[in-house]
């Protein structure tokens, strides 16, 4: 199905600035050449330009690429990490935060139970 991002096994964001004039082939070249990753993996790759008001998402669907584009409404900005030359894995929760304009790290958010440590019971 076109644009079903839930089919992605992982999400990676390309930190820093990306030239938003790039299309599928240019974004694939960044993934392959700069980060030595496979753009045809079941991974959602996210890119952001200097203005931080639009992002592109690239996903391989098995028979072709899907390129998604989101532009924030008036004065909206994405909180994008600017570490140059880095690609970063993010969770689906972080993706939700990012896509709505929040920062990737939300210190006051509840952590999933798997990150809180093991619970012990006493007999």
Segments predicted by a language model, with ranges:
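Polybasic/polar functional segments that serve as interface/processing modules
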Residues: 1-123
């Amino acid at each position: 199905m076109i644009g079903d991002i839930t089919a992605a096994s992982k999400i990676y964001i390309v930190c820093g600035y990306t030239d938003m004039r790039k299309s599928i082939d240019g974004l694939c070249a960044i993934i392959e050449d700069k980060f030595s990753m496979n753009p045809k993996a079941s991974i959602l790759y996210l890119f952001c330009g200097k203005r931080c008001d639009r992002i592109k998402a690239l996903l391989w669907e098995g028979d072709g690429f899907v390129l998604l584009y989101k532009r924030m409404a008036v004065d909206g900005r994405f909180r994008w990490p600017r570490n140059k030359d880095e690609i970063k894995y993010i969770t689906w929760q972080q993706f939700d935060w990012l896509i709505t304009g929040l920062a990737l790290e939300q210190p006051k958010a509840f952590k999933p139970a798997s990150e809180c440590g093991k619970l012990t019971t006493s007999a």
